[in-house]
Amino acid sequence: MKIENIRLFTAAGQIDLSLDNGVCRYEDVVVEFDGGKVAITGGQTPLKTLEIEFKNEFFRDALVLCDAFERGYGEFVWKKPDYSRLMPWYFGAYEDNKTYCFGVKTRPNAMCNWRCDAKRITLIVDLRNGRLPLALNGRRLEACQMVSEVYEGDAFDALCAFCKVMCDDAKLLTGPIYGGNDWYCNYGDSSAEKILRHTRRIVECTPKDGPKPYMVIDDGWQVCARCTGPWYTGNQLFGDMGVLAKQIEEMGAIPGIWIRPLRTVEMLPKEWVLTKQDNYAFLMDPSIPEVLDKVAEDITRIRNWGYKLIKHDFTTGDTFGLWGFEMSNDYVSQKEFADKTKTTAEIIKQLYQTIRDAAGDDVAIIGCNTISHLSAGYFEIQRTGDDTSGVEWARTKKYGINTLAFRMPQHNAFYAADADCVGITRQLDWNINRRWLDVLAKSGTPLFISIGDDAYTDEVKADITEAFKLAVSNDVVSRPVDWMENMIPQVWDSAFGRDTYEW
């Protein structure tokens, strides 16, 4: 790739840089390029972004698919290039039986976005601290490593291969990931009794002598409930959370649990608070060491209770004040971080590393509402799309199926890609909803199910039993055959053959 232009944006404005033997200089700033690696050394100059523009010598009339900032919101689609479109992390362009892929390696120290049209391809390296310019004060920042590949043939195969180029150190589980999660049948109206009943149903649908399923306790167990901490005990409907973990294990399942680590109603030192929410809860600032210590303490406590899977949620929304679909170049709406010496990406990675270290190697982690490219290598499982539903089929169709198809290339390259649960309630037509169960069970990706108390019929039980049988017997990812023509693919190839679904 030939670099055409390099633009540095500081608090004072735009500076056009000249490249000399892989190095650009401006006052106290040095930008180095080495084999795709981009490093920046800076002094007191407040830095905002670095734009690296390449001449597009590759495609003219391609279809382009890009990733999302965090989860998908039903927006994944192959479409014509548009330079105004901000493309997080990486993209693929398909033309004349070739796929041209451009991206950065996972876990960069800067937020990275791409733009492209028929003439140019631009990487935007965001060096800011939240929305504020960042002075590196003599520090050398290894911002990112650019990678690009060209593949002949199928675009799905190309993107699967490219995801493995971007991430060569994924933290993966061995064996199938499947079981229960009570959110889409209880929606927080839960209890230990309901969890144990749900566990019993999950276990009785599990293949005889098959691998143990998970049973994940979602929101509603904590003392305050209402999607907020503190996280030091169960409420009166749950009691001792360590006892409950042991009961789940004795029933034949692996205990898992949900937590929102940055939100609490506890009285905190005011310095820890990023912002107040809903007039009663506080969002903690992840740039503060003492906040990270508290997060580690909560994760460690849950691990010590005996939970072998921890699903942590909302850290992107609680830090940035926006959902992924709301984010543009100015993606932070919250107050300023207390620590103004790090990039936003470094602050987020520090939080993820804290959670990883506190959980230890014997506890699996699901990241939900976490940043995909920064999660890879830290977490075994990633919720790749926004919530499906136990009450609204249109939501499952939009978020679940679209996400499953278009983020499938990340599965077992970045992490296990979890497109979310099958919510089984009386409010959804089982004749339609069972198709979502089927495509997910055959996909080779995680399969979690929420079973409503009034929806566990003999027919549903038989369908779940068959789905679990499929899920544990296959680790080959399915393929959305018509994904270039259809945002909600109907034709799927899997290890079990070709299926066409009427959604």
Language model: regions and residue ranges:
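Carbohydrate-binding surface patches
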Residues: 34-37, 440-443, 448, 482-503
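Non-catalytic C-terminal accessory domains or segments of carbohydrate-active enzymes
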Residues: 1-15, 475-485, 498-503
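Catalytic cores of secreted or luminal carbohydrate-active enzymes
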Residues: 439-475
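Short strand-loop junctions, especially beta-strand C-caps/beta-turns
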Residues: 183-185, 220, 427, 452
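Carbohydrate-recognition beta-sandwich/jelly-roll modules
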Residues: 1-213, 309
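Aromatic- and carboxylate-enriched substrate-binding clefts and catalytic-loop regions
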Residues: 89, 211-426, 432, 460-461
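Short coil/turn segments at secondary-structure boundaries
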Residues: 419, 451-456, 479-484
